[in-house]
Amino acid sequence: MFEKRPKLFKNRDVLSPLFVPDTLQDRKEEVGAISQYLGYILDGATPPHLLIVGPPGSGKTVTTKYVINELEKHTSDAVIEYIVADGTAYQVATSIARAPRRGLGFLNIVEKIRERASEGKMIIVMDEIDKTLSRDGDKLLYHLSREPNVCIVGLSNKLTVMDMIGDSGVISSFKPRRISFAPYSAPQLEEILNYRVEMAFNDGVLEDDVVPLCAALAAQRNGDARYALDLLSFAADIAIRQLKGVVSESDVRMATDEVEVEFIRRSIEQLRDNQKILLYAVMTSQGGTPTEIYRKYNKMAEEQFGGNALTQRRLSQLLRELELYGLVEIEVVGRGRGRGVNWHVVPSSSIDPDLMLEAIRRSL
């Protein structure tokens, strides 16, 4: 059984989105900005709070981890904690404090964080910070942002994540420096893949057109590097399953169906409920003007999902976020009389609508 498996991989883990390379392709400007701010800790100063935003797969996490790894080579005094902030304020606080999740009150946990910070300057990286803010994360941010020795580095797919902070006191004390990540281009994705291919695969097991095709398809998915890596690893899995010694373009084409399902599931999971309802409205109305989508959304939110109506301005912001994630396309169709451009919103032409609708229904 196992003897017949082709030996394509040297190290399959290199294709994981969790892998942090020794060197980064592109993102030099973002590395420079993050390292400049966090580097103040080497001078004995607390770095300013940072907010790193960009669409999924744009390199926020891997870039931040890369800079943190480099920083740790130059200091042993800093207390650095990386967490995925996808829980309640209490759950996130216990992770930062490394405290048990039972038996202590919230303020007791905050005090333990203070004790850790007193050991030296503390950097807290909160990946997916929007998820805790969508619950009760305000109250944790309230305390952390007021600690003189604490630097908060928040990562989010949401461009408007600051709008999720309802406490004006938190907004005043947090005031992060914002660093934005743009989607990767096809050439950038190809460079990323080529770097990892050298470590991941044995020589000569990829046909020449495999990497360019993975990069081109991922560029159509709003430049998502994780999608490109998934395509490459799934294609290799298919080749191994078919007992082939080489990964071909046809394997990549076959892998798109498997990766599509995973991509859609992951894309929907990272949306807030109001974004899911809005996307559902776009999908079921087959597109239309923002006004038409606005009416459809409010009707669905009230009648079907028990949600609250949004202002048209806020709804337009959410549509722009969905466009950034590659889930919808906004088409300019002409100019109105004295009212600027007219535009329509349609589902992404690169995503299977039936798979998308099913994923939304399952998540709501």
UniProtKB/Swiss-Prot annotation:
The keyword Kinase does not apply. CDD domains: AAA. InterPro entries: AAA+_ATPase, AAA_22, Cdc6_C, Cdc6_lid, ORC1/CDC6, Orc1/Cdc6_arc, P-loop_NTPase, WH-like_DNA-bd_sf. Pfam families: AAA_22 (PF13401), Cdc6_C (PF09079), Cdc6_lid (PF22703). Keywords: ATP-binding, DNA replication, Nucleotide-binding, Plasmid. Gene3D superfamilies: 1.10.8.60, P-loop containing nucleotide triphosphate hydrolases, Winged helix-like DNA-binding domain superfamily/Winged helix DNA-binding domain. It comes from the Archaea. The keyword Signal does not apply. ATP binds at residues 58-62, 184, 196. GO terms for molecular function: ATP binding; ATP hydrolysis activity. GO terms for biological process: DNA replication. Belongs to the CDC6/cdc18 family. Involved in regulation of DNA replication. NCBIfam families: orc1/cdc6 family replication initiation protein. This is ORC1-type DNA replication protein.
